[in-house]
A protein has these predicted regions:
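Conserved structural position within tetratricopeptide repeats
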Residues: 55-58, 89-92, 128
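Short, conserved micro-motifs composed of acidic
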Residues: 69, 76, 105, 112, ...
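Start-of-helix register in tetratricopeptide repeats
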Residues: 31, 65, 99-101
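Short coil turns that delineate tetratricopeptide repeat
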Residues: 27, 61, 95-97, 131
């Protein structure tokens, strides 16, 4: 397939160049547009940059620089197949030796479409050009390890077992954080769709704000049916994400951020909890009141164990969440706090698991024995991978990658496991009619030998 794609690209370039002349004016205009596109890109306006690079390529289809810059912008917008096509064009059209950043970008694009041998080649070239110190800043050692990890998984013929939910819930927009309730009859998840409350768009990524969605299984249709009114009173005009619900559906944890709206009930992302009304099952939502949990930094993606009782009948729950309060030393970290007889202990970083990169979307089993999370700085397939750790001798064990049966070469997050039905859910970057976005998946672990399944 890779040879076929390369052949088609070469053929398309050859056909393009036959008898074609690019005027000096068009070349100059293309160069000017590339400069404008770079300014937009570095200002974080990637969508506008991508359109500008497209115009540059139209003016001069033989500009390798236009193809390269367009491919990079498309990569950041998760248009991976288009990025792959344009970066192949750039490789053919650019005759001069390139710098390390170019090789790094090409490697990332090949990695995103699972062209691992090519990705490793360009990562190696990038490391050679950039040198040891700068290569570390680009995480090239991690990226090369990821290539080796993928090849190892391929050599074992490990098949991915994740199956996407239907298009009744998955779309070209982002869906993530799937939670199953009531014997798989109810599905709750978070999405960034045009119907979001307030119709607000995030300036940073030009995507809609988050809302919580509910879908119920329809026996007649044999499919999910979204129930929009069910969540209307809980979604704000800000960011609303559901992170955890107890198995009986009576308690849950959310991440809410209204700092960018007129509501401004939060100063940043904060962790909220809810309990359901016994009569009508409505949610009573309140922020967790602890200065060491909710701070002025980002806090969210919380998960919590069931209540355990010691010999003195002290009630204890363990909550794990994500914060960027140590952003001067790392990006996002996992933190743990205990609720002991309804009082919160001081939140502390989980030093055994945190890296200099990003740890996110934890999930703790009901008994508190296993902790799952995603990281982009541990040995894995690429992007975020899902790992698990076991609580042994009063500390968390070395993280174990769930492998290619669950993870992919792109981002995999929001893992949850439901032992009563031996089913898990995950969110992954997925191809939806040529457009890559977060979709929600489920997988059956009935025949799995993972230790958390057979405990």
């Amino acid at each position: 397939m890779q040879k076929l794609c390369s052949t088609l690209v070469i053929l398309s370039i050859s056909l393009l160049t036959i008898g074609q002349k690019i005027s000096v004016l068009d070349k100059l205009t293309s160069k000017k547009l590339i400069g404008e596109g770079k300014e937009l890109f570095y200002a974080g306006r990637v969508s506008e940059a991508m359109l500008t690079f497209k115009r540059a390529k139209l003016k001069n289809p033989l500009s390798g620089e236009a193809c390269y810059q367009l491919g990079v912008a498309q990569f950041y917008l998760r248009s991976y197949y288009n990025a792959y096509e344009n970066i192949n064009n750039a490789e053919i059209l650019l005759s001069k030796k390139q710098d390390g950043e170019y090789y790094y970008d090409v490697g990332r694009i090949f990695h995103s479409v699972n062209k691992i041998d090519s990705a490793k080649l360009f990562y190696t070239l990038a490391a050679k050009e950039l040198g040891p110190r700068i290569s570390k800043d680009y995480d090239l050692d991690i990226l090369l390890e990821q290539c080796d990890f993928v090849k190892n998984q391929e050599s074992q013929n490990i098949q991915n077992i994740c199956k996407p939910f239907s298009r009744a819930v998955n779309s070209k927009y982002d869906e993530y954080g799937a939670i199953l309730l009531y014997d798989k009859k109810r599905l709750l998840f978070t999405a960034r769709q045009p119907e979001t409350t307030g119709n607000n768009i995030n300036d940073n990524d030009q995507k809609f704000f988050e809302d919580i969605y509910r879908a119920d299984w329809n026996e007649q249709l044999q499919d999910w049916k979204i129930n929009i009114p069910a969540m209307e009173e809980y979604n704000t005009e800000g960011f609303d994400a559901l992170n955890f619900i107890s198995r009986d559906g009576t308690y849950g944890l959310l991440t809410i951020n209204t700092s960018a709206t007129v509501e401004k009930s939060t100063s940043s992302s904060e962790i909220y909890e809810f309990e359901t009304d016994e009569e009508d099952s409505s949610w009573y939502i309140d922020p967790i009141r602890s200065e060491s949990i909710n701070t002025s930094y980002f806090e969210g993606a919380a998960t919590i164990s069931d209540t355990s009782f010691d010999e003195d009948e002290t009630a204890t729950q363990t909550m794990v969440f994500v914060s960027d309060r140590r952003s001067d030393k790392s990006l996002t970290d996992l933190y743990v706090a205990q609720r002991i007889d309804d009082k919160w202990s001081e939140a502390k970083p989980i030093l055994e698991l945190n890296t200099l990169g990003r740890e996110t979307t934890p999930f703790i089993t009901a008994d508190g024995r296993f902790l799952f999370f995603s990281s982009d700085a541990l040995p894995g397939m690429g992007g975020y991978d899902v790992y698990y750790s076991e609580w042994v001798n009063e500390s968390w064990s070395k993280p174990t990658n769930l492998g290619a049966s669950i993870n992919t070469v792109n981002d995999d997050t929001h893992f949850q496991y439901f032992p009563e039905i031996k089913t898990g859910t995950i969110s992954s970057i997925h191809d939806f009619d040529g457009y890559f976005s977060y979709d929600i998946f489920s997988f059956d672990l009935s025949n799995s030998d993972f230790p958390f399944v057979n405990q």
